[in-house]
UniProtKB/Swiss-Prot annotation:
Belongs to the chaperonin (HSP60) family. GO terms for molecular function: ATP binding; ATP-dependent protein folding chaperone; isomerase activity; unfolded protein binding. SUPFAM superfamilies: GroEL apical domain-like (SSF52029), GroEL equatorial domain-like (SSF48592), GroEL-intermediate domain like (SSF54849). It holds the Pfam family Cpn60_TCP1. Its main location: cytoplasm. This is Chaperonin GroEL. It comes from Acinetobacter baumannii (strain SDF). Forms a cylinder of 14 subunits composed of two heptameric rings stacked back-to-back. Interacts with the co-chaperonin GroES. Together with its co-chaperonin GroES, plays an essential role in assisting protein folding. The GroEL-GroES system forms a nano-cage that allows encapsulation of the non-native substrate proteins and provides a physical environment optimized to promote and accelerate protein folding. It catalyses: ATP + H2O + a folded polypeptide = ADP + phosphate + an unfolded polypeptide. The keyword Isomerase applies. It comes from the Bacteria.
Amino acid sequence: MSAKDVKFGDSARSKMIAGVNVLADAVKVTLGPKGRNVVIDRSFGAPHITKDGVTVAKEISLKDKFENMGAQLVREVSSKTNDIAGDGTTTATVLAQAILNEGIKSVTAGMNPMDLKRGIDIAVKTVVENIRSIAKPADDFKAIEQVGSISANSDTTVGKLIAQAMEKVGKEGVITVEEGSGFEDALDVVEGMQFDRGYISPYFANKQDTLTAELENPFILLVDKKISNIRELISVLEAVAKTGKPLLIIAEDVEGEALATLVVNNMRGIIKVCAVKAPGFGDRRKAMLQDIAILTGATVISEEVGMSLEQATLQDLGTAHKITVSKENTVIVDGAGDAAAIAERVQQIRAQIEESTSEYDREKLQERVAKLAGGVAVIKIGAATEVEMKEKKDRVDDALHATRAAVEEGVVAGGGVALVRAVNALEGLKGANEDQTAGINILRRAIEAPLRQIVANAGDEPSVVINAVKNGEGNFGYNAATGEYGDMLEMGILDPAKVTRSALEHAASVAGLMLTTECMITDIPEDKPAAPDMGGMGGMM
C-alpha cells in the first residue's frame, strides 16, 4: 500500500479552493450571450472549440492532487446538473464557486461549518420554492423557440428547428441530433412507428426505383417465433388473399420453405406480401411486438399463451393506413389500434421509466413511448468544417435538453434575473442560531454571481447592472446581448425553471460538503528509479 499525504483544516481547504477556482474560472468565461470560446487541445486531430460548460469541465485535470480533488468535486456539480436538466452547467459551476468563496470567509472567521451548511440548505429550499411559484408554463411554439435559442447561445435558427420538431412529434416524441452532410441545418420527421428492421428478402420490394415495399391498408400478422413451415401460414394466406389486401408478417424470422413460398406468391401477384424480422432481442422483442399489436389492433400469435399460427384468423390480424418497408427500416403509419389501449400502454411504459435505474433502459423505454405517442424527429446539423460541426452539435444538444426541461417545469426570467429576484424571498429569513443565519446570508450574496458573470463577459460593469436590476420589479432585467434593460420574458430571454433549480441545488450541495471538509488524503507519488542504460552497444560510434 502506497504512503498517503494528509492535510488538515485551512491548509486542506485552501488547496481545494485553489482547484475549484481554476476549473470554475475556465468554465465561467462561456456564460451568457457574449460568453467566450474555450479551445481544448486534442492529442490527435484538430483542437476542439466549445462554449459548453460541461465539456470544458470534463477536460480539466490538475497536477496537484489536492487541488485536483477540489476541481473534480465541482466538475461533479456540472455533470449532475447536465444529467438531470441537460443544461445550466456553467450556472451551477459559477454558483458553487460563489457559495464556496463566500462560505470559506465565515469558516476562517471561526463559525461552525455544519451550521453554515444548514443555513445554506434552508435558504436553497426557500429559493427553489420561490422559483417554482413564479415559473410560467412553456407550452406554445414561441416560448419553446425562445428557450432553445437562449440555450444554443442566442442562435435563433436552432431554437426554430427544435420548436418545429416538438410541434411535429409532440412533447413525448423522440428528437435526436445527428451530424448532417451539408452546410444547412435540416429537420427530418418520421410520423408513425419506425423500427430498425427491413425486409427479409429484396424480392419483397414492389417499388423498384426506391427499392421499398409499400403496402396500402395491409393486414399485419405478428408472430413471436421462427416460421419455416409454410403449412402453418396457409390458412392465414388464403383468408387474406380473398380480401385482396396486402399482408405484412413480423416474426422472429421467416426462412426455408416458408420464405420461398411467400417470395414466389408475391412475385406472381397472387398475394402482395412482405416479411420482416421483429425488432429488438429477448424480452425487449416481446415488449415491442406487444407495442405493435396495440398500435395496429392485432394479437401476437404466441405459443406461450396457447395460440397456434395454424389456427390464426383475420380477427387476430392488425391493420394500418400504410406501411413502408425499406432494406433497413419499417414505418407503420396510422395503425388501427384503440386510442384508449394505446394511452394505457404509454402510461404503463412511463411507469417503467420511473422505476428503471439504467440510463440505457430508460432511453429505450422513452423511444417506445415516442413511437406509440408521437413520432421521431432528427435534427441534422450543417457546418463548413468538422470543428464547427462538433461545437454546434454541443450547443444543439444543450438547447434540446433545455427545451424539454422548460416543457416539464415551465420557464422563469433568464439572464440570472430569477435568482436575483429570489433574494426577496430570503428577506427576514433566520436560522436557529447566528451561524445558520450567516449561512442564509452566504447564499443571498452568492445567487447574484451568475448575473455578475454574464455582465462581466459582456464587458459591462456588474455592480451597476446588479443595482439597476435590484431596483426593478418582476421580470425586469438586463439583456447582455444588446445592453438594454427591460422585461426579460418580452425580450424572449427565458430559462427553464428546472435548469435554474437544479443548478442551485447541486451547487449548494457540493459547496456545503466542501465547507464541512476538515481533512484531505491522497497518495504520495512514488519516485521510480530511472531506467538503466542499454548495454552491449559498444562500437556504435
